[in-house]
Design a protein with these regions (language model features):
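Short, flexible helix-adjacent loops and helix caps
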Residues: 18, 65, 214, 354-355, ...
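Short amphipathic alpha-helical coiled-coil/interface segments
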Residues: 30, 366, 385, 473-480
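Globular "head" domains of long coiled-coil molecular machines
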Residues: 34, 38-281, 336
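Charged, amphipathic alpha-helical linker segments immediately N-terminal to NTP-binding catalytic cores
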Residues: 1-21
Length: 494
């Protein structure tokens, strides 16, 4: 629908390859940037220690392949990408990559580094035939603010590089509470080379949301209220596109539910309600109790480890409410965990504008390369670079979105919200931009787009509109025109 900024970025990289044809190091950078354009969107999962990053990553993928214990592999940046056959590759800081054995224990992927120390590993790359990785490459990062300076430094170096673009196109940032350290990281992320492009490409997740209400059945309702409050926070709003509450453990276990999990919850559902509630006052009491008959301590310990008390309570309540098979229960638990909303946001905020985010990263990477290159090389590319940045509408949308979220324009709150929506701040499909249902007809879409176009055109023509707001109006107008052009080209009746 919009100007193909990714085509312009690819053309610019071809030109850069000609300019740097005798510089092997620069050509390697250009090749890497071209690979980013051609590959799937890269999303890093970041957060403080014990925020639940690996658990959430497993939930998104739909398989337990990311280690969630406190082992040495959680201290390494690990890439998860789609592959036709399972494969694990260790990339050391010094030396050649080496293949690691692919092994699973109790359904989980096990990483065995052999004699290699975690601090000597630059990254692990896991190729896995998971549908959830077809259009995404997910990057698991060590915890920020770890007591170990080495662990924390790895994440900082990867997520906040000083002179190069970040290796990820977007970030899912997990927080349990809104602390100053979370804001400091997100602010630093925005100030990296990628962030200086004037974009907002972080999505916050209120993680372990089931623990907010002490495991009560209404915990996620309380979490949703808190997430909504955080999303309006004036300190967080300029740094993240939204806040989504997710019970990561519940989401992971729902996506990987076993028949034995369902059968164990069925046994609990048949108990007397008061007896069951007394039994579930604590995890230790639940595991050690002799009742119910037919459910041993090992089975109960597995349930607690996989679902937590909140997940068990919710699963039992759903079974008592009429759910009678594990597939239906898994779908409902995943939906209630908040995973569905997160996946929807990833799709609407990141995947639908993946080309723009990848092109933006390539342009920023080329800018970084030129800063450290001989002046004659920079001069040969600077004009083309500036032309692309000025003409690619996707880049202008991303920059305006960042400006709108910082409150840097003299627009009313209502107009700011509308502009943010029209430039794709809540999703880049035409219905989402126009606030319509996903099933809206082309006629409804063109009618709504025309109304928006006329409203913003009047504002642009108003002599009292300030220059900065006028620039914003022009970007919004171009977005509306893009929608109209795309839908006017459709055959009648579609």
């Amino acid at each position: 629908m919009m100007d193909p900024g990714i085509a312009g970025a690819s053309q610019l990289l071809r030109r850069a390859r000609e300019v740097f044809q005798h510089d092997a190091a620069a050509l390697a950078v250009v090749d890497d940037l071209q690979g980013r354009l051609e590959g799937p969107l890269r999303i890093a999962v970041a957060g403080m220690v014990k925020a639940g990053k690996s658990t959430l990553l497993n939930a998104i993928i739909g398989e337990e392949i990311a280690p969630t214990d406190a082992g040495e592999c959680t201290r390494i940046v690990t890439w998860y990408r789609h592959g036709h056959t399972p494969r694990i590759t260790l990339h050391p800081i010094l030396g050649e990559p080496q293949a690691l054995p692919v092994a699973r224990a109790d359904g989980r992927l096990v990483f065995n580094l052999g004699d290699v120390r975690a601090e000597d590993v630059e990254r692990l790359v896991v190729d896995w035939p998971a549908a959830g990785l077809r259009d995404l490459t997910l990057i698991d990062t060590p915890g920020i603010d770890s007591l170990s300076q080495d662990v924390s430094g790895r994440s900082t170096e990867f997520l906040l590089p000083e002179d190069t673009p970040m290796a990820a196109d977007a970030v899912i940032y997990l927080l349990r509470h809104l602390h100053a350290s979370d804001l400091r990281f997100l602010e630093s992320f925005k100030d990296t080379a990628a962030g200086k492009s004037g974009t907002v490409n972080a999505l916050a997740v209120l993680s372990r949301a089931d623990e907010i209400g002490a495991g009560r059945i209404d915990s996620l309702i309380s979490a949703a209220v808190i997430a909504e409050r955080y999303s309006r926070d004036q300190n967080l709003r300029p740094l993240a596109l939204g806040v989504v509450p997710v019970a990561g453990l519940l989401a992971q276990s729902a996506r990987t539910m076993r028949q034995t999990d369902f059968e164990a919850m069925q046994v609990l559902a048949q108990m007397d309600r008061k007896q069951r509630e007394r039994l579930m006052l604590s995890a230790n009491l639940f595991i050690r109790a002799a009742e119910p008959a037919g459910l041993g301590s090992d089975a109960k310990a597995s349930l607690v480890q996989r679902f937590g008390l909140f997940g068990i309570r919710l699963g039992v309540a759903l079974i008592r409410g009429g759910i009678s098979n594990p597939t239906e229960l898994a779908h409902e638990l995943a939906r209630r965990s908040g995973l569905g909303q997160l996946l929807s946001n990833i799709s609407s905020l990141f995947q639908t504008r993946a080309d723009a985010l990848k092109a933006r990263a390539a342009v920023v990477g080329l800018e970084a390369l030129l800063r450290g290159s001989p002046r004659e090389h920079a001069l040969a590319l600077e004009a083309d670079l500036e032309k692309l940045q000025a003409s690619a509408h996707e880049f202008r949308e991303l920059k305006l979105l960042a400006t709108l979220r910082t409150g840097g324009l003299s627009l009313t709150p209502e107009l700011t919200a509308e502009a943010e929506q029209l430039v794709g701040g809540r999703g880049s499909t035409a219905p989402l931009r126009l606030g319509l249902d996903a099933e809206a007809t082309p006629e409804h879409i063109t009618e709504a787009a025309r109304l928006c176009l006329n409203r913003w055109r009047l504002m642009a023509e108003n002599p009292l509109t300030e220059p900065a707001a006028l620039d914003a109006c022009r970007v919004v107008l171009r977005s509306c025109e893009g929608i109209l052009a795309a839908y006017s080209a459709l055959p009648a009746g579609r």
